Amino acid sequence: MAYEIVCESESKRYRSDCASVLTKTCEILKSKNIIAQFSLVGSGAKNLITRNGNGPYDLDYNLVVIKADERYWKDLRLLKDTVRNALNKAERKDFFSDAMDSRSCLTTLLHFNDSPNVEFSFDVAILTKNRNGDYMRLIHNKNAFCFGYDQYTWNEVPKSHDVKEKADAIKAEGLWQEARDRYVELKSMYLSRQDNTHPSFVVYVEAVNEIYYKYFR
């Protein structure tokens, strides 16, 4: 199996529903003293929703925490649980399943009664920025001995602070299709290796950096 890009017209309805859920999620989080913004991975450039063969369509979102009470920074389990509970509260239960806590994101499945054979995997990664401006992903180390079992940590995404500017430069030069193709190639490569340590945003940053340095260095 290998990933392929889903056409934008095909995914428009589902992006709209997911965006609505995440807008409500951010409103709920604000009432909990967490200020956050969400974005579809690769949004602002071109559609990067993928599908692995006949598997679920993948909608990958980043939820970037901009500001939060100190208690959340001191207790990352509390932060992730608060986001998960807000996401569950915001979801329309006739369409969405409850969010599951995976290693690097919250995952829920999206179903529609009029399209029973269509299933979407709706993944929400929790991010923030460090002092250097690079993104960091909230990771639940369920079985990583080096961190201690069942620990929560921030994991830096290298060379990610200016990924939007690099993507804009690539698009301006008419090279975005090459970046999209490389994104799909990398996702498929990691899939073939059964590598679960490279979620979509990490792969996106890798693809953008690779194409950027190929033409602009």
Where are these predicted regions, by residue range?
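Helical scaffold of the NTase/Pol beta-like nucleotidyltransferase catalytic core
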Residues: 1-40
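Alpha-helix boundary/N-cap detector
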Residues: 9, 13-16, 20, 74, ...
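Charged/polar, solvent-exposed surface patches and flexible loops
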Residues: 16, 20-27, 81, 85, ...
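Short glycine-rich, low-complexity/disordered patches
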Residues: 25-41, 92-107, 194-206, 215-217
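Active-site nucleotide-donor binding segment shared across nucleotidyl transfer reactions
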Residues: 27-59, 63-73
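Conserved catalytic core of two-metal-ion nucleotidyltransferases
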Residues: 29-33, 77-132
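Short C-terminal domain-edge/linker segments immediately following a structured domain
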Residues: 68-74, 92-95, 153-161
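Right-hand nucleic-acid polymerase module
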Residues: 102-105, 115-217
